[in-house]
């Protein structure tokens, strides 16, 4: 479970911003929505609000970039650069400074802190700590690219791993690839227990989950679709062979069609045929019709694949992060998804959901605690984005019945400044 993520010098984020999933003990409302990790109460859901281009996506992208760099570090060639690193552009001094990422998390009952700093050429700093008690214990530290510090009882063994590492690779990944027990579980948290999604990634992973779905997932998916008033009573799912001539006739360029055929032959590419079953009343009575999923609304597609993803997360104590979760979804559907994470019968493993949105229709203290609501605001005069929580405001301007109205009135910032008085239509 994620406790905290911090980043700096990434895209519009110049100075360090922190997203905390640790519940504020002074917020007493909806304590039954919290999940427990050791001695800490954690949020199961966090929402990030803000205007368009305020930087909401950038903090989520920072997490995505860090996770990608960790997962694929060991595949990086010695001469490969780190093009994913994107420093703040509107200050020339920041171009020469590293981008920083820091995670605090709990995995398999242990609390860890892992972070690194990198530019587009190499890893500048890196560290991993484990909390055996209330204070962190060093597993390793790395400074100035290749200056390592290890506990005395691990120094000889860890130095052997360090000799196998390169300046553009993360020691966490390199040591794990050589079966280092101390780094394996922290690495596996990044490999398996946290993911950042946009719609295409939801669709891609959802397809794989549905392809392997057991009866329990199928029943859960259909019940959710029915409860959400989609009038879908079933679905069919087929994996189709890739036939080049069919792809060419559909208008796909020959080269791409041939590439898909080769991928399918090698077990990498697949075509899926999914249809949703509807019951429609006709003059002759009720009839069953099947509609290809791609002809359903984007919201139907998103909920179809998204529910599969969420169910899998709830079975595996996963933290899922979704950019613009509300896109294409009715607010009531989004509320239902959020409430799934609060439901202890459904969310038995304490899965977490973090998402960005600018849909204020469900911005309410009936659906969120104060410490679950974050705002991202951009100062366009200098190009910097900052992140802060509704919980940072004193109690007086935060009333249970007017959070949405107060936000629209600008009391919490993070709204667009619109001036159309001189506009000629």
Regions found by a protein language model. Name each.
Residues 5, 101-103, 123-130, 273-282, ...:
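Short polybasic amphipathic segments
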Residues 8, 203-295, 411-412, 416-423:
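Extended helical coiled-coil dimerization/tether regions that scaffold
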Residues 13-15, 108-112, 122, 134-136, ...:
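Short acidic/polar mixed-charge low-complexity motifs
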Residues 36-47, 51, 60-113, 119-123:
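Conserved P-loop NTP-binding catalytic core
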Residues 113-252:
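Electropositive, glycine-dotted interaction segments
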